[in-house]
C-alpha cells in the first residue's frame, strides 16, 4: 500500500511512478475504527491475504492524507459505506462492490462473473443557461446508451464478463 500511495508523488525512483493514473484507495470501517482507537493495522498481500507488515493505523492514515495533500490524490473510497448504499435489488442477488472506477465516480458490483462497465460523459454546468431548456440531457443519455449497446454487440469473448455486466445493468453516468 505504501508504494501504491506514493506512485504519484513526483520524487523518488522514476520506475516506481505513475503520474497519470488517478486512483482510489478503499477505506473500510474497520480501518477507520483502528485509526480512532490507535490500533495496529495489518498490511496484507492482496494475492494470498498473508500479513506482510503491521503498522499503526494512524501512521498509515497520516500517510494517506499527506499524499492527498501533496498530490490531490488518491481518492478515498469508503467501501463499506458504498456497499451499505447498494440498491436492495443488487444486494438480493448477492452482489457486492469491491472497488470503484479509477476516479471514484461510479460504484458497481463486481464478481467472478462481472466486470463493472459504465459509459460516462459530462456537461459543462457553467453553460447551464445555454442548454437548460434543450434536449441535451436526453440526447446525451440516448447517445451513452447507444455507445453501451455498441459495446455489447461488439465485445469479444475475452471480455465476456464486462459484456455480461453491461447487458445486466446498462450503467450510464452523466
Task: State where each predicted segment sits.
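A generic short alpha-helical patch detector that favors 3-5-residue windows
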Residues: 112-115, 136, 169
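Core structural elements
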Residues: 143-153, 163-174
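Active-site cavity-forming subdomains of large catalytic enzyme subunits
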Residues: 1-130, 157-164
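Long hydrophobic segments that form regular secondary structure
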Residues: 130-138
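Short coil-to-beta-strand
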Residues: 115-119, 142, 172
Amino acid at each position: 500500500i505504501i508504494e501504491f500511495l506514493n506512485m504519484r508523488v513526483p520524487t523518488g525512483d522514476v520506475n516506481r511512478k505513475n503520474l497519470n493514473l488517478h486512483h482510489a484507495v478503499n477505506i473500510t470501517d474497520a480501518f477507520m475504527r483502528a485509526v480512532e482507537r490507535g490500533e495496529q493495522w495489518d498490511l496484507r498481500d492482496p494475492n494470498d491475504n498473508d500479513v506482510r507488515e503491521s503498522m499503526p493505523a494512524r501512521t498509515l492514515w497520516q500517510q494517506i492524507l499527506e499524499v492527498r495533500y501533496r498530490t490531490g490524490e488518491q481518492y478515498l473510497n469508503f467501501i463499506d459505506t458504498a456497499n451499505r448504499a447498494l440498491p436492495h435489488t443488487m444486494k438480493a442477488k448477492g452482489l457486492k462492490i469491491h472497488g470503484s472506477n479509477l476516479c471514484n465516480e461510479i460504484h458497481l458490483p463486481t464478481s467472478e462473473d462481472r466486470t463493472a462497465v459504465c459509459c460516462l460523459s459530462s456537461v459543462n454546468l457553467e453553460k447551464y443557461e445555454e442548454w437548460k431548456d434543450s434536449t441535451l440531457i436526453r440526447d446525451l443519455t440516448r447517445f451513452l446508451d447507444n455507445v453501451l449497446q455498441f459495446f455489447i454487440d461488439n465485445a469479444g469473448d475475452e471480455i465476456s464478463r464486462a459484456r455480461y455486466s453491461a447487458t445486466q445493468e446498462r450503467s450510464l453516468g452523466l
